[in-house]
Amino acid sequence: MPTVSDSANIADIHYIYQSRPNKERADKVVKRKLGRLGYQLDSKNSDKDVLTATRGNNVHINYSGTNVKNPRDLLSDVALGVGLQQKNPQFTSRKRKTRSIMREYGDDKEYSLSGHSLGGSILMNTLKESKSIRDRTNKAMTFNAG
């Protein structure tokens, strides 16, 4: 299982996808930085919204935070502020993606989830709204959720 420090570092590394529009180049940088933490990047299940990394029996899923240059993220922050997260496509798409990742890896893995800023709020909502994800999550951490 990741330490709090590992989870915070993974959340920070995830922002590389926001600053580098070329996914292949971003994957190379993310892979190198995750490797320093002992994690392997699951490139197929990683993008600007969700980063998936593995270490041993652990599958770590991180939800990215607000990208202030992305109107979709800013609208999500507003929706969150007025209590409309259930109607927000970012919330539902990340739940769907998390379920898909968990199905792909199976029941014999330990799952940890993290999220920073908007990603932390989406994570809390995902755990609240999805019993199947909540029941399979061994550890969840948020950083500056809101």
Walk through the language-model features, giving the residues of each:
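N-terminal trafficking/processing presequences and adjacent post-cleavage segments
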Residues: 1-7
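A conserved cap/lid and substrate-binding interface adjacent to the catalytic center
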Residues: 2, 13-15, 21-112, 130-146
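Gly/Ala-rich beta-loop-alpha elbow adjacent to hydrolase catalytic centers
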Residues: 114-119, 123
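Short glycine-enriched nucleophile-adjacent loop
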Residues: 123-131
